[in-house]
A protein has these predicted regions:
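Immunoglobulin-superfamily
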Residues: 1-4, 11-139
């Protein structure tokens, strides 16, 4: 909106305020290979560009981690935690990996202009159990 000011020797002067807001950009992240049950995991999501305020969220398989609906609230009971480190950084932490933690994780950064997300797939290698079954024979 123009801000017009009158001066004694000038008939009018108009000033325009232009505000440009930069949309967020999220750095690529990846999960380590060869993860197995029982290990710990820490992954950082970093927003490398964008004007504040920026909201950073983690999602798993299309559900927001730490969200208010019952489906996404289950992540806390599964040992998945999200910690905000600063305005541009968020940490995803799992203290004891289970096969149920496997899936597609996304870090989504949003501000008043746009949202930007990066995704990676977490794979948990299963444990091989050699079962020897004896089938009873009936005579």
């Amino acid at each position: 909106m123009p801000d017009c000011t009158a001066a004694p020797f000038i008939s009018h002067a108009c000033f325009f305020f232009l505000q440009c807001t930069v949309s967020p950009l999220v750095e690529r992240f990846a999960f380590p290979k060869n993860l197995t049950r029982g290990k710990r995991l820490r992954v950082i999501c970093t927003v490398t560009e964008g004007d504040l305020p920026i909201e950073v969220e983690w999602w798993k398989d299309g559900l927001k981690i730490g969200g208010s609906n019952p489906a996404s609230a289950k992540f806390g009971s599964q040992g998945i935690q999200v910690r905000r480190i600063d305005e541009y950084t968020s940490l995803l932490a799992i203290s004891f990996l289970e096969t149920t933690h496997a899936g597609n994780y996304s870090c989504v950064a949003s501000n008043s202009v746009a949202s930007f997300s990066r995704s990676a797939t977490l794979t948990i290698r299963g444990e091989f159990i050699d079962l020897k079954l004896e089938i009873p024979r009936f005579h």
